[in-house]
Each structure stands twice: as structure tokens, then as C-alpha cells.
């Protein structure tokens, strides 16, 4: 499985939990440095950000993907739209949460969000 990380660096412990939850080995982590310029249109920045992951059109469509979205909500929304356009579906998304009472602040894997399954379920409620 290929992890595309648009957020903070994932640790070996995070990846071990991902492998346990998904039942698949992480073959590669693509680290994408994410910074948005408030003075420029966000859609073009999201496009460039996803481009910078360096995947080919075939890879976007055929690799088993897990995405760690940017923390900034507008960036995350646009990155998701861009990814859906390239993959043809909503990718699985990693959700991290703060570890209670950790100093310094630490984060742990909370769950893997299956956005495509959520979308398909929601369509039944139309």
C-alpha cells in the first residue's frame, strides 16, 4: 500500500498501526510538503500539491492508496477533489488524534476512514 502524506511526518509506530488496521504492508510513504499561500487561489495550489507527489496517472488509478490529508480544512477539501478526479474514487484517509495527557503533544492513529464506502452509503439515503 502506498501512503501519500500531506501532513505531519508519520512515525514507524503510526505505520505499524496502519498495517495492522488495513492488513496490508506499507510499501512506500510519499511525503508531500504542504504549505498554502493565502494570497493565491487555493485550487491551483492543491493541483500543484498533488502533482508534487510524483505519481503517474496509472499509479493514481491502480495503486492501493491511503492518504493523510492536510490539516487545513480548505486545503483538505481541494486535495480530496483533486484526488477523486485522478483516482476515480474517494481514497481511504488516515485519521490521527492527540494522545491524552502527552507532553510534548503526541498523536496516534485513530482510524482509517473509508470515504468511498461512506459516499456509497450516503447515496442510498437520497
Describe every region a protein language model picked out.
Residues 1-62, 78-81, 85-126:
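Long, low-complexity, Lys/Arg-enriched
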Residues 62-71:
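Short glycine-rich phosphate-binding loop at a beta-alpha junction
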Residues 71-79:
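Elongated alpha-helical scaffolds
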